[in-house]
Amino acid sequence: MTTFPIDLSAYKPISLDPSNPTLTDDQRSALKANIQLCRDAIIFFTATGAARGVGGHTGGPYDTVPEVVILDALFRSQPSQFVPIFFDEAGHRVGTQYLMSALEGSLPAEQLMHYREANSKLPGHPELGLTPGVKFSSGRLGHMWPYVNGVALANPGKTVFCLGSDGSQQEGNDAEAARLAVAQHINVKLIIDDNDVTIAGNPSKYLPGYDVAKTLTGHGLKVLVGDGEDIDSLYRNICEAINTPGPIAIINKRPMCPGIEGLEGSNHGHDVISVPLALKYLEAKGHSAAVEYLNSIKKPSNDYKFLGSGDKWGSNRNVFGEAVVSLLGKMSEEERKAKVLVVDSDLE
């Protein structure tokens, strides 16, 4: 098996004490090194999915690396104080779970190079019992916070974290979970990646008036807002959340895919990074072996012919979208505005 071309042994397993909200220079340096290492690894192994034509998601796991490596250091320092699981209500950010499984030794790093490949046991959402090291199952947005409330109730005296997103917080399940967490004073901490990006575009444009902080404050949660790329501010907010009993939401403002040329701030970062952009990123970071491996991947071909089917293939959501566009294209702009109402489920 080909060796994973980015040296994950360079990860620095530091410990952080939540009673001290100020990072030392050494701690800050180690965290920043871990963040860069993990982000580079996520770019590489998710891009193998793009190279094979099986898709995937890069931006979500890439974006949330800073909070994940901080939590990892906290879990290592005070394991009895936490439920040491990176619960994530955005199932498509599964790259986080796979990478952390590899770092803890549950999953061979080389297996990451088969991300979303058939029979690799690395599907597009985490599946408990399928992938070594994965500790929960998670589907589409909005279904994990209620589950995490239950985990917290089952572990009194411990702090439970749930990685969230501004997209997830639009879902009704999360509204119910927020009200229950406040009513029962559940010790759950939400760390929300607020990048103003979903697959449909920018919520600030297509859902004006929606605000994550105001929404959660309205449910009764204490809310801390900060810059997700400012490691000192992020760590202070996480420490404050830990040291304050009850439900708290930390909202991290950041653009989608910070630092990735061609993707930063774009909703295209939600999906898997394209091979050309991944190659450009990895070359700039000096990962020549990763570049060589990506260039060597051959997209599988299917030579079978199916009766009644053409040569064009597409996902259900794309086929549906193209069908709608073909119908609307026969109408004038005035007619479309007068007769057509679009109700978007955010899964087109």
Map each language-model feature to its residues.
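Glycine-rich ThDP/TPP pyrophosphate-binding loop and its adjacent helix/strand module
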Residues: 77-79, 83, 126-287
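Thiamine diphosphate
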Residues: 1-161, 287-348
